[in-house]
Structure formats: C-alpha cells, structure tokens
Amino acid sequence: MEVNHWIAMADCFFVTGGTGFVGANLVRHLLEQGYQVRALVRASSRPDNLQNLPIDWVVGDLNDGDLHQQMQGCQGLFHVAAHYSLWQKDREALYRSNVLGTRNILACAQKAGIERTVYTSSVAAIGVKGDGQRADESYQSPVEKLIGAYKQSKYWAEQEALTAAQQGQDIVIVNPSTPIGPWDIKPTPTGEIILRFLRRQMPAYVNTGLNLIDVRDVAAGHLLAWQRGKTALTRGDRYILGHENISLQGILAHLSTITGLPAPKNTVPLWLPLTFAWVEEKVLAPLGRSPSVPMDGVKMSAQEMYYDASKAVQELGLPQSSIKQALADAVHWFQNHGYVKTQ
C-alpha cells in the first residue's frame, strides 16, 4: 500500500469514497469546517473530484487488512465508499466491496482506535412502502423484496455496521435518499436524467417518484451525525438524509423552468422499457458489456421511492435546502464541466 505524508493533528477524519459524488461534497464540507481529511482512494480511481484540495491520500482498497495503520491519528471515520451497479452480473463484486469491504473497514477502525464512525448506508437498504407512502427509519422491507443485487448488498452492509455497533463500536448509520447538486462526476442515475434532459434525449419517460436532497445537505448531515447522532444498537437506529418527495414529472417541470427547455409530455408504459432492458441484457451479458438500461433500474421506476426524513431534521438539524436550487446548481455544474454543450 502506498501512503503519502500527512500532518498529525486533532480532528482528523479518515474518509472512504471521497472521489464519489457524496464523498467529494463531504470532503469539501469537512475542509470548510476546519478538519484535516485523509482520503482512501483506489489505485484505479481518477480523483478529479478532489484535485487541488489540501487533503492527504492513502492509495488502497476497502479490503486491505492493514488500513488500521493508515487510520492512526484520525479521530473519526466516514465510510462512504460503495460499489454501485444495477446489473445483476456484478453481484459478486457488489458483495465483495459493499459487504466484505464494510466488515474490513470497521474492523480496521476498531483496531486503529477510531472514536466514532459514520457509515453511509442508503434508503436502498430500507426499501419502499409503495402506494405513495413514506417510509421512515423504523420501516424495513424484507431483504428478498429489495430489487436487485445493489440494494441487497447495501442491506447486508448495513447489518455489518449494526453488528459491529452492537459489539461495542460507536457507529452512526445514515441513509441518504437521492442527492442532487455539483460534483456528480460519474454521473449518478439522477444526474443522467438531468443530462438526458439537457441533451434533448428524453422524448418520453416512465413517471416515478423520488426523494431528493441537495448533496451538500447530505454532506452536512454526515458531520452532524458524527457530532449528534445516536449509536446504532437496534434496527431503526439510523437517519434518513432526505428532503422532498417529488415525481419525475415534477423534476422535469423544474428543469424546464430552470433551463427554458420544454419538458417531455409523453409517458410510456412500463412494459416497453422492461422489454428493451430484457433484450439488451440478454444480448450484452455474453459480451461482457453493461446494458444502457439495466432491468433492475426499470423495475425500481415502477415504485414511488418516498421517505420521511423528519427524524434527521429534528435530531441532527439536517438542512433542507431548496430542491429547485440544487437542480439548478447541478445543471450549471454539468454545463460548466463540459457534460453538455451550452447554446
């Protein structure tokens, strides 16, 4: 493992997943609050999201057994990293990174004497109630009903965090909903929706429902969880980091207002993208190529993924910034970073 030199100081946080969407915003928030950041990055990662930031780098993998050595001197851990894929072919990679990686990171944190860990789970691990009902932290869909290997891996990873906490580690679990805003470099599926809208590649859509939150509020929520959150000891000891429940139609209407571009008016029945996804996966799987429309993603769109974040607002002081402004900031970030041609 390769390690660069870091400055020993108090209030140092070890962050995994710092090159990702949530992680990059979290790193910036921690720096703004005056904390030292030590970030774990994979050798294959492109740390474009963290360029020119005054942080210390540790090059390694979530499953490296000697990470405790690199955590020495840090007060806290934010375990944000996760492998994200909606393609069933990646099931083993999802389990290895999300579940076994979480188990190893937490074991290393304990060995390093980390005082408190915030584990970034997801509302994906909670599941949905359906029929437009909002799920809160006390709700749990049976794991077999969670759609796809990614959601199931996040469920089992959260169980790793809960087990470690029950065995004595101080761990706070947060479950972000659907973040939007700047630094969506990959981009996320929601970022892809924004880009398809901007590129005029969305003649029609399958209407669904999401819980959106400004990604910078998610970042702030992580630090607030470290400062004020309750240690996870029983199921439900977690914090949904979310804000506004909104239909995809509503999101597209906001984007139309922000950009002046017309929103698509036509919806398509679910069977159409399901058929396309099924055919695409059957053709591409033998070739080792990822489908453009994963079957699990289409199945998820059949559900309104609505959540109640009032617990995090009341107990942590989770900010609730304007969703329309977060969408506008995402649009401007994509435009300013070459993702879409500006007129």
Curated annotation (Swiss-Prot):
Q: Which pathway does this chain act in?
A: Secondary metabolite biosynthesis; flavonoid biosynthesis
Which GO molecular function terms does the record list?
A: dihydrokaempferol 4-reductase activity; oxidoreductase activity, acting on the CH-OH group of donors, NAD or NADP as acceptor
Give one GO biological process term: flavonoid biosynthetic process
Which keywords describe this protein according to UniProt?
A: Flavonoid biosynthesis, NADP, Oxidoreductase
Cross-referenced CDD domains, in alphabetical order? Answer: AR_FR_like_1_SDR_e
The protein's matches in NCBIfam families, at most eight in alphabetical order, are given as: HpnA
What the record says about family reads: Belongs to the NAD(P)-dependent epimerase/dehydratase family. Dihydroflavonol-4-reductase subfamily.
Name this protein carries in UniProt: Putative dihydroflavonol 4-reductase
Organism for this UniProt entry: Synechocystis sp. (strain ATCC 27184 / PCC 6803 / Kazusa)
Lineage, uppermost ranks: Bacteria, Bacillati, Cyanobacteriota, Cyanophyceae, Synechococcales
